[in-house]
């Protein structure tokens, strides 16, 4: 895995820190209210330092994010991309990630993925997983391929009538 250059030179890409907590929560709430917002609140409430959240900033405004997992990320701070980590020597994970709707169509999605990949490579990961996505054509240009796929199975259970 090689370090790749970012397209956008007018934005700052960096790891979050505890001082970003309120801005990151507000950013998530404004763009993805619900689960992702709750995950950020829970992350900081569980002792997260911000290190697992990568930010793209336009001046001081968060305009994109990616959550990453490092081989040494605590179990209570990991995302789904890291559930396989015991099967790898030094697994890294990317996801979830997103770009503020006002900043889309500027290749920031590409850059936040590349930045996440670069950060994980610099942290000596052996492999990187992006879990639970259907966006295969988005991730393939960055060297990602399907490793596992899931099939959902269902069974209709007919309700039995009881006679009383």
PLM features: residue spans?
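Conserved active-site alpha-helix within GNAT-family acetyltransferase domains
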Residues: 110, 122, 126, 132-152, ...
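A short beta-loop-alpha structural element at the N-terminal edge
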Residues: 10-24
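A conserved mid-domain beta-alpha-beta active-site/ligand-binding segment of alpha/beta enzyme cores
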Residues: 28
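Conserved acetyl-CoA-binding loop-helix of GNAT-fold acetyltransferases
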Residues: 96-99, 105-118, 141
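Extended hydrophobic-aromatic, low-complexity segments
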Residues: 24, 35-37, 64-66, 74-79, ...
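Acyl-donor-binding surface of acyltransferase catalytic domains
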Residues: 1-8, 153-157
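A conserved beta-strand-loop-helix scaffold within acyl/acetyltransferase catalytic domains
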Residues: 32-98
